C-alpha cells in the first residue's frame, strides 16, 4: 500500500467515527438477529440503502453503544480507486490504532458502504467475522452486490436485507403525514386525506428523491434510475451483446405491468420488427432485470415445477411510480399500480408469492404465504362499487377458495367503505389503504 492511500484510509476512519447520522426517514425493514453473520443491505439503486445504514448506526447509538464503536466507511471515493483486497487490512488496523483498548474486549460495528468496489472484499469480511469481535453491515450497488452472489461469495456468512423504495406508510412518514390512528378511527377529513395520499403514492411511487418532485422532473429522475440500472447493472456487467433487444424487453415489461409475459410471444414480436435474438437470451435478460430489482416476476402457484416453467410469469416494476412514465396511453392506471404496490408490500413482509389459475380459467392475482404461516388469496382492483365489477372481481376468488381452504380469500380495493353488496362467504374485503398500512382485517 502506498503511503497516500494509507493516509486517506486513516483520515476517512476518523471522519467516519466523528460524523453524525444525517436526517433520515425511518424504514420499516426487518433485520435478522443471528450472531456471527454479516448483514448485506441490497436493493434497487436510489432506494435508500445508505440512509438505512445510518438508521442502523443511529439505532445502536440510541441503545447506548459509544459512538466510537460504530464506524461508517464509504468506499466510493476516487482517492480509493486503486484499493485492493490486501489494503483492507489497514481499515482494521487503522481503527484499532485509535482504540486499542477495545480489541478482543468488546464488540464494535463496521458499516461498509459500497465495499463492492474493492476486488476480493468478501475474503476480508469473512476473516473479520472469524477472527475479530466485529458486527458487519455491507451495502452496495446491485451491479456487484446481488443476493445470490452474496450467498455464494460469503459462503453462508452473510444474510441479505432487502431495502425497497418507500412503502405507503414510509412515504406518509417522510411527508410528516403518517396516521397515528387506524383508518376507521380517523375523522372524515383524515380519511379523505389518506385516500388522496394513496392515489398520489400510486402515481408518484416510493423512491425517496421523487417525493415532492414536480411531474416533469420526477419522470426524468425515474427514467435516469432505469437507464443507469440497465446500463451499469445489466449491459456493462453482463457484456450484453444485443442492447436493442434488452431495451425492448424492459420497455415492454414496464409498460405492461401485471400482464403475463411469454418469451415465445415476445420473441415473435422482436422477429417481426427485424430484431434477431435467441429465446435463451431473452430468458437471461429477464433474469438480469430481476437481479437489478427493476422487475419482480411472479410465477404460477403450484407444487409442480414443470407447471411453473411452462406457464407465463407476470412481471411488475419494483415501484408503482415507474408505471406512469412508461404507460403508453399516458393515463394513470391505478388498478395496475395498486396491484404492484400490493406485491411489493408482500415482498417487504417476507411473503412467498404466486398467482392462481383455477381449472375454469379464472385468475387470482396473488397467493401469499407469510412468515407466520398464514396464507392469503388476494384479488386487487381499483374499485368494486359497481355490481358488475364486484361480480367480475369476486368470481375468481369464489372459484379458488375451495381449492385453498387454508387461505383467507381477500378483496382489496381503493374504496374506503366495503361494497354495498355483501360478499359471498368466505370472502373478505379490506380497504387497500388499511392493508398497505398493516392494519388487521376488520371484524
Predicted features and spans:
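Accessory nucleic acid-recognition modules appended to NTPase machines
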Residues: 3, 69, 215-374
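Domain-level recognition of nuclease-like catalytic cores that cleave nucleotide substrates
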Residues: 414-443
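Hydrophobic positions on the alpha1 helix immediately C-terminal to the Walker A/P-loop
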Residues: 52
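Hydrophobic anchor at the beta1->P-loop junction of P-loop NTPases
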Residues: 41
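Short glycine-rich substrate-engagement loop in P-loop NTPases that contacts/grips substrate
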Residues: 73-105
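N-terminal pre-Walker A segment at the start of P-loop NTPase domains
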Residues: 1-30
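Conserved lysine of the Walker
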Residues: 49
Amino acid at each position: 500500500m502506498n503511503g497516500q492511500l494509507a493516509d486517506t484510509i486513516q483520515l476517512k476512519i476518523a471522519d467516519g467515527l466523528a460524523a453524525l447520522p444525517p436526517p433520515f426517514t425511518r424504514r420499516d425493514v426487518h433485520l435478522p438477529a443471528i450472531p456471527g453473520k454479516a448483514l448485506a443491505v441490497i436493493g434497487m439503486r436510489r432506494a435508500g440503502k445508505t440512509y438505512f445504514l445510518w438508521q442502523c448506526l443511529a439505532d445502536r447509538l440510541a441503545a447506548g453503544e459509544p459512538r466510537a464503536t460504530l464506524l461508517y466507511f464509504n468506499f466510493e471515493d476516487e482517492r480509493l480507486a486503486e484499493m485492493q483486497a490486501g489494503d483492507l487490512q489497514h481499515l482494521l488496523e487503522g481503527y484499532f490504532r485509535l482504540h486499542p483498548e477495545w480489541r478482543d474486549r468488546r464488540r464494535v460495528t463496521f458499516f461498509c458502504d459500497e465495499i463492492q468496489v474493492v476486488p476480493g472484499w468478501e475474503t476480508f469480511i469473512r476473516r473479520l467475522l472469524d477472527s475479530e469481535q466485529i458486527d458487519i453491515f455491507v451495502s452496495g450497488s446491485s451491479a456487484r452486490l446481488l443476493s445470490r452472489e452474496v450467498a455464494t461469495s460469503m459462503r453462508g456468512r452473510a444474510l441479505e436485507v432487502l431495502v425497497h423504495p418507500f412503502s405507503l406508510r414510509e412515504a406518509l412518514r417522510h411527508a410528516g403525514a403518517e396516521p397515528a390512528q387506524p383508518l376507521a378511527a380517523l375523522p372524515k377529513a383524515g380519511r379523505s386525506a389518506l385516500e388522496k395520499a394513496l392515489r398520489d403514492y400510486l402515481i408518484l411511487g416510493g423512491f425517496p428523491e421523487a417525493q415532492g418532485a414536480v411531474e416533469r422532473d420526477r419522470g426524468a429522475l425515474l427514467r435516469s434510475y432505469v437507464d443507469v440500472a440497465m446500463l451499469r447493472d445489466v449491459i456493462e456487467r453482463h457484456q450484453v451483446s444485443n442492447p436493442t433487444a434488452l431495451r425492448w424487453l424492459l420497455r415492454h415489461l414496464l409498460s405492461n405491468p401485471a400482464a403475463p409475459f411469454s418469451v415465445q410471444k415476445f420473441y415473435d414480436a422482436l422477429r417481426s420488427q427485424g430484431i434477431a435474438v435467441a429465446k435463451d437470451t431473452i430468458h437471461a435478460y429477464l433474469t438480469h432485470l430481476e437481479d437489478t430489482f427493476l422487475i419482480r416476476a411472479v410465477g404460477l402457484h403450484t407444487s409442480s415445477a414443470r407447471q411453473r416453467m411452462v406457464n407465463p410469469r407476470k412481471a411488475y416494476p419494483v415501484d408503482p411510480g415507474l408505471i406512469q412514465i412508461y404507460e403508453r396511453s399516458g393515463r394513470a392506471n391505478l388498478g395496475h399500480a395498486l396491484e404492484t404496490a400490493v406485491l411489493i408490500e408482500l415482498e417487504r413482509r417476507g411473503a412467498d408469492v404466486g398467482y392462481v389459475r383455477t381449472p375454469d380459467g379464472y385468475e387470482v392475482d396473488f397467493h401469499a404465504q407469510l412468515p407466520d404461516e398464514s396464507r392469503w388469496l388476494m384479488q386487487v382492483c381499483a374499485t368494486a362499487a359497481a355490481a358488475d365489477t364486484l361480480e367480475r372481481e369476486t368470481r375468481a376468488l369464489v372459484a379458488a377458495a375451495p381449492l385453498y381452504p387454508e387461505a383467507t380469500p381477500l378483496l382489496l380495493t381503493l374504496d374506503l367503505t366495503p361494497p354495498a353488496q355483501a360478499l359471498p362467504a368466505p370472502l373478505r374485503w379490506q380497504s387497500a389503504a388499511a392493508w398497505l398500512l398493516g392494519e388487521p382485517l376488520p371484524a
